Amino acid sequence: MNGTTNFDRTNYFQNVPSTALDLALWMESDRMGHLLGVIDQARLDEQRGVVQNEKRQGENRPYGRVFESVLRASFPEGHPYRWTVIGSMADLNAATLDDVQEWFRTYYGAANAVLVLAGDIDVATAREKAQQYFGHIP
């Protein structure tokens, strides 16, 4: 189980045997549909620290801040691609619990998601399982 984020999307992915498909779908639907209820200030602060450490690690590598300079030189003031996906330390420090919850409600629902299943599964079963696990999520 892993995930990545870029300018236009966040993706979560799992490579599992077909015998673990129900568990994987349950975990992803739980993240999408029920995570918001357990995000509190303590968890936000913990994850903020994790992200800040990731940012510092990137910046402390040789040429670690070059990409920021390239973005500023490539995109006009106000363009969303002008800054890195991770944001600035000031952005990270300023994010509130309300900000995170609103972002989650706006962007991380089933209406904005694409589910891809590949492997030992037929289309009818995939559709049935998608409805079972994600159908109740707005």
Residue ranges and their predicted role:
Residues 1-138:
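Charge-rich, well-structured scaffold segments of protease-associated domains
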